[in-house]
Amino acid sequence: MSTKEKLISHVSKEEAVGSRNKVTVVGVGMVGMASAISILLKDLCDELALVDVMEDKLKGEVMDLQHGSLFLKTHKIVADKDYSVTANSRVVVVTAGARQQEGESRLNLVQRNVNIFKFIIPNIVKYSPNCILMVVSNPVDILTYVAWKLSGFPRHRVIGSGTNLDSARFRHIMGEKLHLHPSSCHGWIVGEHGDSSVPVWSGVNVAGVSLQTLNPKMGAEGDSENWKAVHKMVVDGAYEVIKLKGYTSWAIGMSVADLVESIVKNLHKVHPVSTLVKGMHGVKDEVFLSVPCVLGNSGLTDVIHMTLKADEEKQLVKSAETLWGVQKELTL
């Protein structure tokens, strides 16, 4: 008789029940692991699966997490380079992708990531045909479009992390400027996650008080308070962090967990995430950009109709045209 048999008496046979809230993270780089730990610390899944092509790194990361399982509510943390480990995931977060080389064109980086996605996406679909696909890899808007095309999923089940982080950065800087908590500062960054993102100055408010009514020049030239610099800090923020520490990780990881939470808990919260915007705000092409969207357990359920000013809408259309210029050159 083993120690286990001496210690434990079986009362009933345990029936195998699959995970109800399984989350997979593809790619165990800095962003992937920050996303994984953020998801675990918010108790969002009953099983976490990690996938990567680098077997030693993958094994090391999963062991490191498993060693801390006493401090977590999620006791089942698994990893493999074989995608069968991801089977029946509710949400699959894709953070894998090539890094931009010095002097490499954006288009070249995109095509390299498209080639990586051609392997990743069909494997996700094979093992989790009903999952919600969340793309985090950059350039996120174009790669969300690529994932949508390669997966064959309906548009509501393919979401890009988009400007959820840009908007969080915006609210943080706004809070610093006003000496308020970011959650009390309301403002939206929409459009492309990156250089051509669009700040919706007309909607910036605190407690329902529109800041543009108090300062009509807010966000424009000739504003003595230079609020335009807030958006510049949002755009430059990632570059600044990369310059200082080599990569971004924690904030994007927390942003991913924020989105996953809205999905698995069916919160119906509004987030600025990347979705198909053809036919909205004058956009004519099949592009993905961030607009305020409602997230719940079936994915992206609704899109909020923003009341944009003419110049804001013009910026959004320009952003869409820039992305389409890159997309139409891709070979899928």
UniProtKB/Swiss-Prot annotation:
Domain of life: Eukaryota
Statement: the UniProt record of this protein carries the keyword Iron: no
A Pfam family reported for this protein in Swiss-Prot or TrEMBL: Ldh_1_N
Documented EC number(s): 1.1.1.27
Residues that hold NAD(+) according to the record: 29-57, 99, 138
SUPFAM superfamilies: LDH C-terminal domain-like, NAD(P)-binding Rossmann-fold domains
HAMAP family listed in its UniProt record: Lactate_dehydrog
UniProt-recorded name of the protein: L-lactate dehydrogenase A chain
Originating organism: Gillichthys mirabilis (Long-jawed mudsucker)
